[in-house]
From Swiss-Prot:
Keyword Mitochondrion: no
Annotated InterPro entries: ATP_synth_F1_dsu/esu, ATP_synth_F1_dsu/esu_N, ATPsynth_dsu/esu_N
Any Pfam family matching the protein: ATP-synt_DE_N
Function field: Produces ATP from ADP in the presence of a proton gradient across the membrane.
Membership in a protein family: Belongs to the ATPase epsilon chain family.
Gene Ontology molecular function, alphabetical: proton-transporting ATP synthase activity, rotational mechanism
Gene behind this protein: atpE
Membrane topology annotation: Peripheral membrane protein
Keyword list, A-Z: ATP synthesis, CF(1), Hydrogen ion transport, Ion transport, Membrane, Plastid, Transport
Name of this chain's protein: ATP synthase epsilon chain, plastid
Superkingdom: Eukaryota
Subcellular location: Plastid membrane
GO cellular component, one term: plastid membrane
C-alpha cells in the first residue's frame, strides 16, 4: 500500500486507510491516482470512488465534495458517503430506472433540479452495485 487515503464527511472520518490506487469522480470526468501523483486539488461530483487495496477494488458512493492530492496522501472532503457493501443490483437498477423516468418527465426547473440530484445518486448506487457483482 502506497497511498494514504482519508475520506471525511460532516460527522467525522468515514474511511481512513492505505491503498494502491484510487479513481475519483471529478466534475470533468474520472481521474486515477497512483503513487507520486502531481499535487492537485479537484472538485468531486456525485459518483463512485473506487479504491484498490490488495488487488481488490472497494467502491464507495459520495455526494460531491473536494479532494486534495499531495505527497501520496489523499484527503477527500465530501457532503456524504455510503458504503456499497449492502447494495443489491436489482433494487439499485430499479431505483436508477425510476430516477431516469423522473428526470425525463420533469416539467419545471425545480422538478428538473430535484430529479437530476436523485438521478445522480441512483446512478452512483447502481454503478457501485455493478462493481460489487463483477
Amino acid at each position: 500500500m502506497i497511498l494514504k487515503i482519508l475520506i471525511m464527511i460532516p460527522d467525522g472520518i468515514f474511511w481512513n486507510n492505505k491503498a494502491e490506487e484510487i479513481i475519483l469522480p471529478t466534475n470533468t470526468g474520472q481521474i486515477g491516482i497512483l503513487k507520486n501523483h502531481a499535487p492537485l486539488i479537484t472538485a468531486l461530483d456525485i459518483g463512485v470512488i473506487l479504491i484498490r487495496t490488495d488487488k481488490k477494488w472497494v467502491p464507495f458512493i459520495i455526494m460531491g465534495g473536494f479532494a486534495l492530492i499531495k505527497q501520496n496522501k489523499i484527503t477527500i472532503l465530501v457532503n456524504g458517503a455510503e458504503s456499497a457493501g449492502t447494495l443489491k443490483l436489482v433494487q439499485s437498477e430499479a431505483a436508477f430506472q425510476e430516477a431516469t423516468n423522473k428526470l425525463e418527465n420533469a416539467k419545471s426547473k425545480k422538478q428538473y433540479v430535484d430529479a437530476l440530484f436523485l438521478f445522480k445518486c441512483a446512478k452512483a448506487r447502481y454503478q457501485a452495485a455493478k462493481q460489487l457483482v463483477s
